[in-house]
């Protein structure tokens, strides 16, 4: 029984246990199947943000899984994923379970715990995530969030379209305005050469191209309107290579000037045909597109990439182009998605682009694992840091301090004026003490105290510098810090937190200082290192500092203690080639004036020391060619050394064969063996061959379209002795494609307008040739009437620094507007000076001679009569008792010296003594200003005497006038001299038939000084004198109108005499200078010259010879017989020391009418009425003189 029961019990137990076991198996299988069936792991995700997980997450993922998530973003966006949770089976090389992320250019493989918290960015707009698990050992898997992050075109270059189906154009929302000038800048790289290439086009509303930049059979051309403007001499097709290079094009309709900025240098040319076109609005701007030719677009577009295309509606200057940065926005079109319609397939993200955001590479050791299990097998992910101001880079590979600036506004209701920085600092540190992030306070400062309505309450603003010790590579956003502070306990001590804001401290922006040292954008307290210039084997350093006053970042000064400069280079025969290569590399960069001088000096040292073979000579020529690209201002100080170095170079070159030519972009030198026994003359020419950019030399004949031709006559060696002829072995030839090295500081008002060629026979000086050397040189710019002058570079001029000299050279009769032929009786550097200012057209040689004759005759007469006026008033004491006479004496003195200095100026200028010329110019300037000033003082005296209502006594009246009349001009001239003595010097005026200045003159050279101290100064005095002239004439005419004892004719004559008298006394005739412009300029120049050169004569006539009191003094002391005036005449009894106010009537008499026959009795009565200088009179005619 027991056995039976026991058996049934075991059977029941087994059946129930088996059922439960089977049920559990079924449930387990059902759950597994449900997990697998409910999780989709092969999907395409296109939402702007979201997340996905491994199957069954957070439970263990199933075995043998294979999943693929494709995250697709629109063009202009990248994909960013973050591993919120990650746990896979660990294994070396992730050979079992793994996640593979394809970012676009590289793959990253993860397993174990390594990816937890990691953020990755795609390089394009697609990212793929693959997950694979094997048959055993499952973990909980992963949870990944993703989002689309907008990126600018700064990170992307665009592939030039290879088919007409691909259109890269400006968006429809962008309207192209009417363009009469433009600047286009972009970066470009070529992958393959084509016969014709189009880079960009602009078409009008009808689809017709009105602007295109392209390569044609004629080279690089800019198509404007309907004209082709060649820029092949500025930029060749070979300059566009596989390396991305910036390029800017400018155009101005008014001048037809086309500029090209490439490789850090600016070149320009004139395209006159483009001046008639205006680019109409409403056009379509395309990258590539249909150019000006009829070639199929598929065959015409350039093969390569374009980047950072920007357009402005004005033409930038070279200085503006050189200062362009990535942040300079095109005001018509900019490199931004909002301006362009570009297919995503045409864009490529490239971290090497010049304006791309910072790129950081995550190294394999970033995840950090000691055992090696679960470490990434391959991890070469490139992660782009999105350029924002409030996002910390999530891919930081080093534990560095991150700085925040916090602004706290606190209300103090306890102590109004206290500084609570210590209390707030303690509160901040306590707040962050037990936080999960390591944050501490590095500084705090009180910025502002505002008194509120209640006297005991103030609102205070504090700035705090917070430092986050980032030891876990975990982001800390500003909002988290703000939230922490707002939720913190109260500050206490009567302080209440009103508001708080937290901002990530700005980085120090990318900077170039000094030249050649480019510092990348840097985080605060980080020190950057860049290679030294020119020696790049050492580094300079610079630290991004924190301003402790306002907690902003700034760059400290660079530390270049480890760097050495160019002057430290040691030159010897052994290292000459190495030094030359170094200097060529240095000169290929933009050099400052100081650096350029150092390079040229070192080249001169090298040429003097080394043996010059063809290879070394070629390198030296390259250096000088690079120097010639620098600004003319930078070349000025180095030109003498550079030219002498080239001269020495061609003398020392060792060569085999009949000749040697060394070419570069801006300089070509040639040396040819000379057979003195069979020399019958020679022709040397410089030209640019087809499909080349560097000039060449032909020693045998005149090349077609030669830039310069030198023909040496058969009699060239005739003046050499036999011993000299035996030593002659070579003919040297040099062609300079740029003229910056030939800067004449005393250029006679002329401008160099040709290439420069130089030729020599050995190192001998050849001059006084029987037959001249014929030099034919092309002009740099076309001119209808060039008026050329042939000159050569004379090293003996200007203290041996060199200058232009025309001795022994003349212009050939077969010269034209494009080329000039020079005939010279010696050999040296030759060029053509040309009057490009067109000043010679205003006054021709004939008129210039006439004006010069009038000026010298007039100034001589004026000086004589100014002296006569002065002597008259000095000789007769009674004439100089009144104020007007004393003022007139000062004015006559000033005019006398002005005319005398002017007459001596041209003669003294011919002595070529700089100090003497400066002295003469200073005195001429001074006496011109004193003349203006005393004319102004004349009008001021009239104002005081005529306009003031009551009698006036001014203490030391004439002394004060003298201080102003002589002191103000002296102060002005003194200031000019103190600022720069070079403001004065010798200049040339007028032009002769040979283009030379016909008149040497010591005068003001600086136009700013001239216009400020002469033109502006005189303008002020002139306007004042005009106003006074009008007032005086109104008073005189009003008085004359009340007189009934004169006829109308007499009144008119008296008024006319007053007008003429005042006109010359107040210098009104100097105003003719304001009208010497345009077609009437010559007429007013004659009027100006005649009247102003004779001003002293007119003053003598009207204010001395025709004055009745002067005539009486002359008659009394200088005449005899009947003409002599008796001593007992009315005049001899009349006092003249009048110090009262002049009536309008008497003023008119004293200035004009009294000189033309006013009665003696009338004048005498007026004088007697005012004998007492301090008496008060009710009579309106009382006077103050």
UniProtKB/Swiss-Prot annotation:
Domain CUB: 41-149
SS bond partners: 41-67, 94-111, 185-248, 229-271, 369-375, 508-544, 532-563, 790-822, 809-824
Ligand binding (17alpha-hydroxyprogesterone): 1092
Protein topology in the membrane: Multi-pass membrane protein
The UniProt record lists the keyword Lyase: no
Alphabetized SMART domains for the sequence: CUB, GPS, PTX
Cytoplasmic side: 871-886, 937-957, 1035-1057, 1107-1185
Glycosylated residues (UniProt): 68, 121, 395, 429, 470, 539, 550, 562, 565, 613, 680, 691, 719, 763, 799, 818
Keyword line: Cell membrane, Disulfide bond, G-protein coupled receptor, Glycoprotein, Membrane, Receptor, Signal, Transducer, Transmembrane, Transmembrane helix
Signal peptide (residue range): 1-32
Protein activity control: Forms a heterodimer of 2 chains generated by proteolytic processing that remain associated through non-covalent interactions mediated by the GAIN-B domain. In the inactivated receptor, the Stachel sequence (also named stalk) is embedded in the GAIN-B domain, where it adopts a beta-strand conformation. On activation, the Stachel moves into the 7 transmembrane region and adopts a twisted hook-shaped configuration that forms contacts within the receptor, leading to coupling of a G-alpha protein, which activates signaling.
Positions of the Pentraxin (PTX) domain: 154-355
Low complexity biased stretches: 1144-1158
Free-text note regarding domains: The Stachel sequence (also named stalk) in the C-terminal part of the extracellular domain (ECD) functions as a tethered agonist. In the inactivated receptor, the Stachel sequence (also named stalk) is embedded in the GAIN-B domain, where it adopts a beta-strand conformation. On activation, the Stachel moves into the 7 transmembrane region and adopts a twisted hook-shaped configuration that forms contacts within the receptor, leading to coupling of a G-alpha protein, which activates signaling.
Protein name, entry field: Adhesion G-protein coupled receptor G6
Provenance organism: Danio rerio
Phylogenetic placement of the source organism: Eukaryota, Metazoa, Chordata, Craniata, Vertebrata
Gene designation: adgrg6
């Amino acid at each position: 029984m027991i056995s039976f029961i026991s058996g049934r019990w075991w059977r029941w137990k087994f059946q129930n246990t088996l059922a439960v076991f089977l049920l559990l198996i079924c449930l387990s299988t059902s759950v597994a199947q449900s997990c697998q069936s409910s999780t989709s792991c092969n999907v395409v995700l296109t939402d702007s943000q979201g997340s996905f997980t491994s199957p069954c997450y957070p439970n263990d993922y199933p075995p043998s899984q294979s999943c693929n998530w494709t995250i697709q973003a629109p063009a202009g966006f990248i994909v960013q994923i973050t591993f919120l949770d990650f746990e896979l089976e660990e294994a070396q090389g992730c050979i079992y379970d793994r996640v593979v992320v394809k970012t676009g250019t590289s793959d990253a493989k993860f397993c174990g715990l390594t990816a937890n918290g990691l953020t990755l960015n795609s390089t394009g707009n697609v990212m793929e995530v693959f997950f694979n698990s094997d048959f055993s050992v499952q973990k909980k898997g992963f949870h990944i969030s993703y989002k689309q992050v907008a990126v600018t075109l700064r990170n992307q270059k665009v592939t030039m379209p290879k088919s007409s189906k691909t259109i890269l154009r400006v968006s429809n929302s962008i309207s192209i305005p009417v363009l009469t000038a433009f600047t286009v800048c972009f970066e470009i790289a070529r992958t393959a050469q084509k016969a014709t290439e189009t880079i960009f086009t602009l078409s009008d509303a009808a689809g017709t191209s009105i602007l295109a930049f392209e390569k044609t059979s004629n080279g690089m051309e800019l198509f404007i309107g309907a004209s082709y403007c060649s820029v092949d001499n500025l930029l060749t097709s070979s300059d566009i290579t596989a390396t991305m290079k910036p390029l800017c094009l400018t155009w101005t309709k008014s001048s037809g000037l086309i500029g090209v900025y490439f490789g850090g240098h600016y070149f320009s040319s004139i395209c006159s045909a483009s001046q008639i076109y205006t680019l109409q609005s409403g056009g379509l701007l395309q990258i590539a597109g249909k150019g000006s030719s009829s070639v199929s677009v598929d065959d015409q577009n350039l093969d390569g990439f374009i980047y950072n295309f920007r357009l402005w509606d004005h033409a930038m200057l070279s200085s503006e182009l050189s200062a362009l940065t990535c942040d300079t926005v095109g005001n018509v079109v900019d490199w931004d998605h909002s301006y362009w319609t570009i297919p995503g397939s045409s864009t490529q993200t490239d971290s090497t682009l010049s304006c791309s955001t910072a790129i950081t590479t995550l190294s394999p050791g970033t995840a950090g694992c000691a055992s090696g299990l679960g470490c990434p097998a391959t991890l070469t992910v490139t992660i782009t840091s999105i350029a924002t101001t409030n996002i910390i880079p999530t891919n930081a590979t080093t534990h560095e301090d991150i700085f925040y600036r916090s602004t706290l506004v606190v209300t103090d209701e306890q102590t109004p004026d206290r500084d609570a920085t210590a209390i707030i600092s303690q509160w901040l540190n306590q707040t962050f003490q037990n936080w999960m992030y390591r944050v501490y306070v590095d500084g705090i400062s009180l910025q502002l105290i505002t008194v509120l309505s209640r006297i005991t309450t103030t609102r205070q603003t504090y700035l705090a510098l917070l430092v986050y010790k980032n030891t876990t590579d975990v982001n800390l956003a500003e909002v988290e810090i703000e939230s922490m502070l707002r939720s913190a306990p109260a500050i206490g001590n009567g302080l209440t937190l009103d508001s708080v804001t937290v901002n990530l401290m700005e980085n120090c922006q990318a900077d170039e200082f000094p030249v050649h040292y480019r510092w990348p954008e840097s985080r605060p307290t980080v020190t950057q290192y860049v290679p030294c210039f020119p020696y790049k084997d050492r580094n300079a350093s610079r630290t991004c500092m924190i301003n402790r006053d306002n907690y902003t970042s700034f760059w400290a000064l660079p530390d270049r203690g480890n760097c050495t400069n160019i002057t430290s280079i040691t030159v010897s025969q052994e290292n000459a080639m190495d030094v030359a290569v170094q200097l060529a590399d240095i000169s290929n960069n933009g050099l400052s004036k100081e650096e350029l001088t150092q390079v040229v000096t070192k080249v001169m040292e090298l040429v003097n020391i080394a043996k010059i073979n063809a290879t070394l000579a070629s390198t030296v020529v390259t250096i000088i060619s690079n120097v010639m690209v620098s600004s003319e201002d930078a070349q000025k100080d180095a030109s003498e050394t550079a030219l002498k170095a080239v001269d020495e170079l061609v003398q020392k070159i060792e060569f085999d064969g009949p000749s040697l030519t060394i070419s570069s972009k801006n300089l070509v030198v040639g040396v040819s063996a000379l057979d003195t026994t069979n020399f019958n003359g020679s022709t040397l020419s410089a030209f640019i061959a087809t499909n080349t950019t560097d000039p060449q030399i032909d020693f045998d004949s005149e090349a077609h379209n030669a830039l310069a031709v030198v023909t040496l006559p058969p009699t060239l060696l005739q003046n050499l002795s036999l011993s000299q002829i035996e030593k002659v072995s070579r003919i040297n030839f040099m062609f300079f494609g740029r003229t910056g090295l030939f800067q004449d500081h005393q250029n006679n008002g002329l401008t160099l307008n040709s290439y420069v060629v130089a030729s020599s026979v050995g190192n001998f000086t050849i001059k006084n040739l029987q037959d001249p050397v014929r030099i034919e040189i092309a002009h740099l710019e076309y001119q209808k009437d060039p008026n050329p002058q042939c000159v050569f570079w004379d090293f003996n001029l200007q203290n041996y620094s060199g200058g232009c000299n025309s001795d022994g050279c003349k212009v050939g009769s077969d010269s034209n507007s494009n080329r000039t032929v020079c005939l010279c009786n010696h050999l040296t550097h030759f060029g053509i000076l040309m009057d490009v200012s067109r000043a010679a057209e205003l006054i021709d040689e004939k008129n210039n001679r006439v004006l010069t004759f009038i000026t010298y005759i007039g100034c001589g007469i004026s000086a004589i009569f100014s002296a006569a006026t002065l002597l008259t008033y000095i000789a007769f004491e009674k004439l100089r008792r009144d104020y007007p006479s004393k003022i007139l004496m000062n004015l006559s003195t000033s005019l006398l010296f002005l005319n005398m200095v002017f007459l001596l100026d041209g003669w003294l200028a011919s002595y070529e003594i700089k100090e003497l010329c400066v002295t003469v110019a200073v005195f001429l300037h001074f006496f011109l200003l004193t003349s203006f000033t005393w004319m102004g003082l004349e009008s001021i005296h009239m104002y005081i005497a005529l306009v003031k209502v009551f009698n006036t006594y001014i203490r030391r009246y004439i002394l004060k006038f003298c201080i102003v009349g002589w002191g103000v001009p002296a102060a002005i001239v003194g200031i000019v001299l103190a600022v720069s003595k070079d403001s004065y010097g010798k200049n040339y005026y007028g032009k002769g038939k040979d283009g030379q200045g016909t008149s040497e003159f010591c005068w003001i050279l600086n136009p700013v000084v001239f216009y400020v101290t002469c033109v502006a100064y005189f303008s002020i005095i002139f306007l004042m004198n005009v106003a006074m002239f009008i007032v005086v004439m109104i008073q005189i005419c009003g008085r004359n109108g009340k007189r009934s004892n004169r006829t109308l004719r007499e009144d008119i004559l008296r008024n006319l005499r007053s007008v003429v008298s005042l006109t010359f006394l107040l210098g009104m005739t100097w105003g003719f200078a304001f009208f010497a412009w345009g077609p009437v300029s010559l007429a007013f120049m004659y009027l100006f010259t005649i009247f102003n050169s004779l001003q002293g004569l007119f003053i003598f006539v009207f204010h001395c010879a025709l004055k009745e009191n002067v005539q009486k003094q002359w008659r009394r002391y200088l005449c005899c017989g009947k003409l002599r005036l008796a001593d007992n005449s009315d005049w001899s009894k009349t006092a003249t020391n009048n110090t009262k106010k002049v009536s309008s009537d008497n003023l008119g008499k004293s200035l004009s009418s009294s000189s033309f026959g006013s009665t003696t009795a009338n004048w005498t009565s007026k004088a007697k009425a005012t004998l007492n200088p301090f008496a008060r009179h009710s009579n309106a005619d009382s006077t103050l003189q």
